[in-house]
Every structure is written in C-alpha cells, then in structure tokens.
C-alpha cells in the first residue's frame, strides 16, 4: 500500500500530476528573460571592436548566460515534468552553475578582490544542487520556488545590474 501511495504522490505527498501551468509571475519573468537576452545580444554586437580584449572567462560567462536566458522562457511556459523539461532543466542548471563558477574568477573591479555580486555566485553554487535535488525528490513546491528565485535574482536582477555603473555590457550598449 505504501509503495502505491509513493508511486502516485511521491515522498513528500505532492501529486505528480498537479497543475503546473505558468502563472502571471512566470509569464512576466519569461517576457523579461527574452528582453534581457535581446538587450545583451545587442550590447555584445555593438561591442565588437573590443572583442579581442575580452578574457575567455567573460566569453564563457556570457555564453552560458545566453543559454540560460534562452531556455528560461521555454521552461517557464511549457509543460513541466516530462523528459524534455528534465533535459532542459539539466542544461539550464549546468549552464547556471558554470556561470557562477566562472564569475568567481572575474575580479576586474574592487582592485582584483571579490565584490558584492560574488555573494550571488556563491549562493548559486550552493542553490543549483539543491534545486536539482528537490526536483529529483519530487518536492515540486520547493523546486518551483527555487527556480523562480533563480530567475528573478540570478538572472533578471543581476542581469539588470550588468548594464549600469560603467560595466562592460552597459558601456557597449550605450556607446
């Protein structure tokens, strides 16, 4: 009896087939992720004359973020829990983890030391495995909450702050 219960409800008592349709917050986040990807792409294109001066760490950081930003709307707006969602989730998680890991080696401000933004990198390095574990355990409430937190904090807010204050993307975009 217990195994049939766990097969249907999972270890945490949440139904696998519970509604996971996107809500308003997720639609807005998907829209903003697309917008941020477009603006970042425009900035990178406008910065072409300076491409030769950019380190491989920055390029890897930008590439993995572009993948995450491109996948985010798909993950937020389509059906969840199927094999495609899981595959895209793994790609999204690996790219976000790589982005955070590489950012620890990017210390061009603050006299080569760590800055406030590096706290977000450490939180991401800890949080991505927790996000994966919550999905594997079918703790869908925690998984969805953490995914939203990453989209809002690690992508949208951090992405917004990559443009002002004489940051590279901002200087390219507004040049």
Task: Give residue ranges: language-model regions.
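Alpha-helical membrane insertion/targeting regions
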Residues: 2-175
């Amino acid at each position: 009896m217990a195994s049939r219960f766990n097969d249907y409800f999972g270890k945490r008592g949440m139904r696998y087939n519970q509604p996971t349709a996107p809500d308003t917050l997720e639609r807005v986040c998907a829209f903003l992720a697309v917008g941020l990807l477009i603006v970042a792409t425009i900035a990178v294109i406008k910065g072409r004359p300076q491409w030769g001066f950019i380190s491989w760490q920055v390029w890897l950081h930008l590439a993995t973020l572009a993948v995450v930003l491109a996948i985010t709307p798909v993950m937020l707006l389509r059906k969840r829990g199927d094999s495609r969602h899981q595959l895209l989730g793994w790609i999204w998680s690996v790219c976000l983890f790589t982005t955070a890991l590489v950012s620890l080696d990017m210390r061009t401000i603050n006299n080569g030391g760590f800055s406030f933004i590096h706290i977000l990198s450490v939180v991401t390095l800890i949080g991505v495995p927790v996000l994966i574990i919550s999905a594997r355990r079918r703790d869908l409430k925690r998984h969805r909450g953490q995914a939203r937190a990453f989209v809002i904090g690690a992508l949208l807010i951090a992405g917004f702050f990559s443009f002002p204050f004489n940051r590279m993307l901002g200087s390219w975009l507004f040049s």
